[in-house]
């Protein structure tokens, strides 16, 4: 059953009953998909919500990321090291803070740390490596991008978040991306924080589910149309899709994002499971999460290999179990098991904080964990070649 609500909703199920509560709907459509098998159900779902977009071939390879690479010099050094070790890497992914210091969300490279972004990306391309960049829907109020949105009244009231529900907002956002970022030859986008309001992150202790939901409803309804709040991620993806298809029709869209809605698959989105914490229990849960996501009709799903958080931090979500990081053989084993699982996912990406994520962080050449990582990455070449053919 597919429901058309874009509002915040609460679903509860137990042995005795199941119920759905939505907060604000002008109307509510129910679609019953009664295909003879799961494949037919997925076909029916996509007939209603749109066909999944095809990614470029490189996006099925190995994507190396880190929280965070800090400079053009570091990125090129990482590319050189992969090449020196003869380990294939298809994409390097630059996390937040590409912008000038203090200008969160500004769609401009920091000229001190990235003096020649076009040259950097051209150098990567010559090595056969693509480049992905993190961009955000919010902009600090001191930035030129924010001021342009504010002048045109295309921000949600009282926030630094652009209004993706308005066509004018989507057009202006892409205009800024194209003028100052896409012009350098960027291959893919990491549309981070596409919720984009997350009150649960403000807690030191994990809030109860009901409390987290109530806070989300309260905070989002105060600034967004209540009947659309859950679909912001999809409208944000529409911004990137329509903009790139118009400006660079020869390039397939790649959009790594954290939130979406029914139909996001038609905008070239890859959903990843967010900032998870390192434990065997979490790895087990990721297997279930990936299967459930795929069953929802979405095509591309991935995760942070080894989990985003490795150590124990102050906040409730910074809850990794390996305070010694890569120095702990137990974490290195968990990391490799995660990588072995991820090698069979639609998208294969290493990312996280607390520890380095390049293969050589696992040990010296010839050691067990290093060789295991090398086998996973090189084996992915054969896996994704077949996967690409099937999906094409």
Regions found by a protein language model. Give the residues of each.
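Catalytic-domain carbohydrate-binding cleft regions of carbohydrate-active enzymes
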Residues: 1-392
């Amino acid at each position: 059953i597919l429901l058309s609500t874009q509002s915040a909703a609460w679903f509860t199920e137990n042995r005795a009953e199941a119920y759905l509560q939505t907060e604000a709907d002008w109307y509510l459509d129910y679609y019953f998909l009664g295909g003879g098998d799961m494949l037919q159900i997925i076909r029916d779902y996509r007939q209603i919500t749109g066909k999944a977009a095809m990614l470029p071939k490189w996006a099925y390879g190995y994507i190396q990321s880190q929280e965070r690479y800090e400079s053009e010099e570091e990125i090129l050094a990482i590319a050189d090291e992969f090449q020196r070790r003869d380990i294939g890497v298809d994409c390097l992914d630059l996390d937040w803070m590409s912008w000038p210091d203090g200008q969160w969300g500004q769609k401009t490279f920091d000229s001190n740390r990235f003096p020649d972004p076009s040259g950097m990306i051209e150098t990567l391309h010559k090595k056969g490596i693509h480049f992905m960049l993190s961009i955000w829907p919010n902009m600090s109020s001191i930035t030129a991008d924010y001021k342009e949105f504010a002048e045109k009244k295309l921000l949600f009231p009282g926030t630094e978040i652009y209004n993706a529900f308005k066509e004018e907002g989507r057009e202006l956002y892409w205009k800024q991306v194209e003028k100052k970022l896409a012009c350098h030859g960027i291959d893919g986008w990491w549309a981070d924080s596409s919720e984009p309001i997350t009150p649960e992150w403000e807690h030191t202790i994990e809030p109860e589910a009901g409390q987290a939901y109530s806070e989300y409803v309260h905070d989002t309804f105060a600034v967004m149309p209540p009947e659309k709040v859950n679909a912001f991620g999809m409208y944000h993806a529409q911004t990137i899709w329509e903009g790139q298809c118009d400006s660079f029709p020869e390039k397939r869209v790649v959009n790594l994002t954290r939130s979406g809605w029914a139909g996001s698959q038609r905008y070239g989105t890859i959903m990843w499971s967010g900032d998870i914490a390192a434990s065997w229990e979490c790895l087990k849960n990721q297997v279930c999460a990936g299967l459930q996501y795929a069953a929802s009709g979405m095509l591309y799903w991935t995760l942070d290999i080894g989990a985003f958080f490795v150590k124990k931090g102050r906040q409730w979500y910074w809850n990794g179990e390996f305070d010694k990081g890569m120095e702990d053989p137990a974490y290195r084993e968990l990391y490799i098991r995660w990588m072995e699982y991820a090698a069979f996912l639609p998208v294969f990406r290493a990312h996280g904080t607390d520890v380095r994520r390049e293969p050589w962080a696992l040990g010296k050449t010839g050691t067990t964990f290093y060789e295991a990582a090398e086998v996973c990455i090189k084996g992915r070449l054969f896996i994704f070649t077949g996967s690409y053919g099937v999906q094409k």
